[in-house]
């Protein structure tokens, strides 16, 4: 089946699909203060989703393209779940968030099919994959249309990988007690086995969102990158997120001696946001298998245990947490009790001495990850490094921070 035909099959016009903002039924906190963060974007009045311009631009989307799609959503007069929120149009039609971003992705998909230059075609496929992922954002469980967009993103990503520099292998990993999971191993030019970074992504992202990290930072240094989806989304959708948050990544780590392209004696983990929860757990539980662990904006304690901090977080992000935990109908009180169990300090890990070198990067006044969380990580390590990343200029400092983190990882791997 061609890519175009697959799109038509998946996205037949229907209007009974549940609208994304209705999937998690929590009691609302009411009015919330505006939130802005480098990794998560910011709350904008009249939008349910956080608008994450920095990360979307970093992944290769033109700012004008973002504004164009937003404008189409705003201008729609179709029925909405909440008339006050632009991105709550019901059904797969004009104005619906998933429809508009997927439509934009199909434009690039068609460009990719028409392009004769393999590298340029690969770029177009990658662009389409990124747009399909934005269509599926924030990847809530039970969002049928979003899951269809994710399927198209994965297909486009595989097409891109066949044409872009280096090599990518789709790999299946067995996990006892449940379904196998699929990961992508990105390898630079040259002969392996390669030193490798195991990517632990955020809860509102897919594993295919991190190609820029590999291409700009790891590949030029001869480092491979292995990604898997976080529990409950994408290729890991059959696994629920539990307090043993690092379960899937641990099984992948244990399988690496059997992967011929990976030098299993030179492996590091890199965690974004909640992915840092996974990475730091690995630092404690699998220290013989890891040379280093790096974190960026870690969610390891405060957000999970501090009610005041949770009150500052946008509704969408709390919906993401509830969705990952399988608590779609839970009260806020029940969600708070459960989140507390995910704190690595409450679990008795953070605060204990850890032999694995750990770096943690943070932004001042980050509503999701205060400086104290990063200090807790680095002070627990026998070889800790704290990295403050200035907020403005946001894009340049984000790039500089990633360069410093990659330097630090490279010294411990190579």
Curated annotation (Swiss-Prot):
SUPFAM superfamilies: alpha/beta-Hydrolases. Its EC number is 3.1.1.1. One of its GO terms (molecular function) is carboxylesterase activity. It comes from the Bacteria. Keywords: Hydrolase, Serine esterase. It catalyses: a carboxylic ester + H2O = an alcohol + a carboxylate + H(+). Catalyzes the hydrolysis of esters. HAMAP family: FrsA (MF_01063). NCBIfam families: PRK05077.1. Belongs to the FrsA family. This is Esterase FrsA. It comes from Escherichia coli O1:K1 / APEC.
């Amino acid at each position: 089946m061609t890519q175009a035909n697959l799109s038509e099959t998946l996205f037949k016009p229907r209007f009974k699909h549940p609208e994304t903002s209705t999937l998690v039924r929590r009691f609302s906190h009411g009015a919330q203060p505006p939130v802005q963060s480098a990794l998560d974007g910011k709350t904008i009045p009249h939008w349910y989703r956080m608008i994450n311009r920095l990360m979307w631009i970093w992944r290769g989307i033109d700012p004008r393209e973002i504004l164009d799609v937003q404008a189409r959503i705003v201008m729609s007069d179709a029925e909405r779940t909440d008339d006050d929120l632009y991105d709550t149009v019901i059904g797969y039609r004009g104005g619906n968030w998933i429809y508009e971003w997927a439509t934009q992705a199909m434009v690039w998909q068609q460009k990719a099919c028409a392009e004769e230059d393999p590298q340029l075609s690969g770029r177009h496929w990658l662009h389409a994959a990124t747009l399909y992922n934005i269509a599926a954002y924030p990847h809530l469980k039970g969002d049928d249309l979003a899951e269809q967009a994710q399927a198209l993103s994965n297909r486009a990503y595989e097409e891109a990988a066949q044409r872009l520099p280096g090599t990518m292998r789709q790999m299946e990993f067995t996990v006892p007690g449940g379904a196998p999971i699929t990961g992508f191993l990105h390898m630079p030019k040259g002969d392996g086995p390669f030193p490798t970074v195991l990517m632990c992504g955020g809860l509102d992202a897919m594993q295919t969102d991190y190609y820029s990290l590999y291409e700009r930072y790891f590949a030029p240094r001869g480092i491979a990158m292995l990604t898997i989806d976080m529990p409950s989304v994408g290729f890991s959708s059959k696994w629920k997120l539990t307090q043993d948050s690092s379960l899937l990544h641990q099984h992948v780590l244990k399988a690496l001696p059997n992967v011929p392209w990976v030098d299993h004696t030179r492996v590091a983990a890199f965690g974004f946001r909640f992915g840092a929860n996974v990475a730091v757990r690995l630092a404690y539980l699998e220290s013989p298998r890891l040379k280093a662990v790096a974190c960026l904006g870690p969610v390891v304690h405060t957000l999970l245990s501090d009610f005041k901090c949770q009150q500052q977080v946008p509704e969408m992000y709390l919906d993401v947490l509830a969705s990952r935990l399988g608590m779609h109908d839970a009260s806020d009180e029940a969600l708070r009790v459960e989140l507390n169990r995910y704190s690595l300090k409450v679990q008795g890990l953070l605060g204990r001495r850890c032999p694995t070198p750990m770096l943690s990067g943070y932004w001042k006044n980050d509503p999701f990850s205060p400086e104290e969380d990063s200090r807790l990580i680095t002070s627990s390590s026998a070889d800790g490094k704290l990295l403050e990343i200035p907020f403005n200029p946001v894009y340049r400092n984000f790039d500089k921070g990633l360069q410093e983190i990659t330097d630090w990882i490279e010294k411990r791997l190579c």
